[in-house]
Amino acid sequence: MTSPVLNPALPATAAAPVAATPSAVGSAGIVAPVFLRFDEPLPLASGQTLNGYELAIETYGTLNAQRTNAVLVCHALNASHHVAGVSADNPKDVGWWDNMVGPGKPVDTNRYFVIGVNNLGSCFGSTGPASINPATGRPWGAAFPVLTVEDWVRAQARVADHFGIERFAAVMGGSLGGMQALSWAITCPQRVANCVVVASTPRLSAQNIGFNEVARRAIITDPDFHGGDYYAHGTVPGRGLSVARMIGHITYLSDDDMAEKFGRTRREPAADGAYRYGYDVEFEVESYLRYQGEKFSRYFDANTYLLITRALDYFDPARATGGDLARALAPATADFLLVSFSTDWRFPPERSREMVRALLKNGSPVTYAEIDAPHGHDAFLLDDARYHAVVRGYYERIARELGLNGAVAPEGNPA
C-alpha cells in the first residue's frame, strides 16, 4: 500500500524514470471530433430510457495492440471532449487540458491513447436537450431526461467497448470529472487500473447545492427560458445563463486570487476619483464577471447547465451505504491518485482527505498530493510545476508497470 504523499516537492513515483526518452513536449496537433452512434437503449438512474444517442469524442495518441494503454479523461461542467490539441475548425480553440495531455506532457500521448468524451446532455456534439427528439421531431428541451454521473459512466463504457478496451490504464478527471473517475472505480472496478481524482469531492456540500440552485433559478426565471422550450421561440435565456456563470465563476477562484487580480481597482473612475453613484460597472471585478457571463451565454446551452448542475447535486456514492464512504468505495480495485489545492473552497482539501481515509481503510493503494496554490478551484486547469510533477510521476509509474517503454507507433486507431 502506498502511503499518502502530502505537499510533495516531487512525488515518490517520479524517482525512477521510464527507460525510453520521450520526444520533446509538444501539442497533440490539429484534432477533430468523431461522433459515435449507439442504438442500444441506455437505462437511466431516473427510470427513464434513452433510445439511441450520439457521443462526440476526440482521441490523442495511438492505441497499442494489446489495448492496455488507454486513458479516459472525464470533463467538468462547462468543458467537452476537446481535451488537447487545436481544433480543426478553429485554430484559437485549444483543448481545455492541453497543458496536461500531449506529447511529452504529464499524460504523454507518445505512450498513452487518450480519449475525451462529451457527456450526454452536453451541448458540444453529444445528444442533449438541443438535439431532436425522434418522438416529436422537435428539440428535446426540458423533456430531456435528468441524468446522473453514473449514467455518464454507463454511456462512456460503451465508448470503451467500441474501441475494444477491456480495462483503462487510467480514468482521470478534475472537479466533476473527478466524480466520474471515482464512479468508474466503484461501478466498473474491473475496467479501471488507476483512478486519478483531482480537485473533487465524494458529494456536494449544502453550500454547493445552494450555489447550483441559485444559478438554476437565474436561468429558469429568465423570461426567455419558456419552460426550457426556448428553441421553439427563437430565444436564448442569456441573462439568466450569464448570471449563473457569474455565480459559478466566483466559486472557482480563491479570495486571495481575486484580490490580486482585481482588488478594489476601479473601472474608468471619474477624473477626481469620485464614485459614479450608480449601478453600472464601477469596479474591475464587476466588469470581469459580466464579461465572463456574457461570453458563456453565447456558447453554452441553458438546459445543459440545468442538467449538469443537477447531476452534480445527485452525486453521493455513500448514499447507498448509509453515509459510509469506505463501504461505498469497497468495490474499487484500482490504485488511486488524489490531488487537492489549498485554496480550493469549492471542493476543499478536506473532501480529498476524506476520500483518502476511506480508501486507506479499505487497503486501497493511494497517493495523495495537497498542493499549496493560490488559484482556488481552477488550479486544476493551470500549469503548476509541482502539480504536474505529481501527475507525471504517477503516469510514469503506470508506464513502467505496463511496459510502455517507448512511443507507440502511429498505425491508426479504430474509428
UniProtKB/Swiss-Prot annotation:
Record's catalysed reaction(s): L-homoserine + succinyl-CoA = O-succinyl-L-homoserine + CoA
Residues binding substrate, per UniProt: R245, D378
One Pfam family linked to the record: Abhydrolase_1
EC code(s) of this entry: 2.3.1.46
Keyword Acyltransferase: yes
InterPro entries: AB_hydrolase_1, AB_hydrolase_fold, HAT_MetX-like
Subcellular location: Cytoplasm
GO biological process, one term: methionine biosynthetic process
Active site per UniProt: S175, D344, H377
Protein name (record): Homoserine O-succinyltransferase
Lineage of the organism: Bacteria, Pseudomonadati, Pseudomonadota, Betaproteobacteria, Burkholderiales
Gene: metXS
